[in-house]
């Protein structure tokens, strides 16, 4: 019985280690997609950037930079509701990130100003 218990403990430990390695691999792949998205966004290729950042979000939905970059991309492509949702997700994941907060505050200010100028 003790031998069986040890085998179960070892199996659970191995599963935990493999899950941790999978998460680290996902973050690494997500980071690669984020960086590629930044490069193509700098060239004005916003659809490609959004595609890369959406792929990164699939790989690692807990990565705040993904959601911040997606929000910026959505803003650039006129998808303001999606931008707002992405900023909210980024803020929820990293509430103390000054860069995300600054981007979201600027988005809200511009969006509010546009809505006041052109009420529906």
PLM regions: where:
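Helix-start (N-cap) detector for alpha-helical repeat units in TPR-like alpha-solenoids
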Residues: 30-31, 64-65, 98-99
